[in-house]
Amino acid sequence: MPQLDMSPWPMVIMSMILTLFYITQLKMLNFTFHTTPSSKLTMSHKHKTTWELKWTKIYLPPSTYQ
């Protein structure tokens, strides 16, 4: 049974790493990064919960006949 020749493997691994780095750099070029991040004024919005949005009628328990 012949053995696998391992001599080209370091070159294959290095070229793969270089290619992945190159592809990553090309993909990062499409992103826009802000150089000076500005703080936005955040206004606090009060979110109403579901029970505040709709009117619910509270029923009394059924009265017992005497």
Curated annotation (Swiss-Prot):
Tell me where it resides.
Answer: Mitochondrion membrane
Q: How the protein sits in the membrane?
A: Single-pass membrane protein
Residues where N6-acetyllysine is found: 54, 57
The record's principal subcellular location, in a coarse class, is: mitochondrion
Biological process terms from the Gene Ontology for this record are: proton motive force-driven ATP synthesis
Q: What does this protein do?
A: Mitochondrial membrane ATP synthase (F(1)F(0) ATP synthase or Complex V) produces ATP from ADP in the presence of a proton gradient across the membrane which is generated by electron transport complexes of the respiratory chain. F-type ATPases consist of two structural domains, F(1) - containing the extramembraneous catalytic core and F(0) - containing the membrane proton channel, linked together by a central stalk and a peripheral stalk. During catalysis, ATP synthesis in the catalytic domain of F(1) is coupled via a rotary mechanism of the central stalk subunits to proton translocation.
Q: What is the protein's quaternary organization?
A: F-type ATPases have 2 components, CF(1) - the catalytic core - and CF(0) - the membrane proton channel. Component of an ATP synthase complex composed of ATP5PB, ATP5MC1, ATP5F1E, ATP5PD, ATP5ME, ATP5PF, ATP5MF, MT-ATP6, MT-ATP8, ATP5F1A, ATP5F1B, ATP5F1D, ATP5F1C, ATP5PO, ATP5MG, ATP5MK and ATP5MJ. Interacts with PRICKLE3.
Q: What is the protein's given name?
A: ATP synthase protein 8
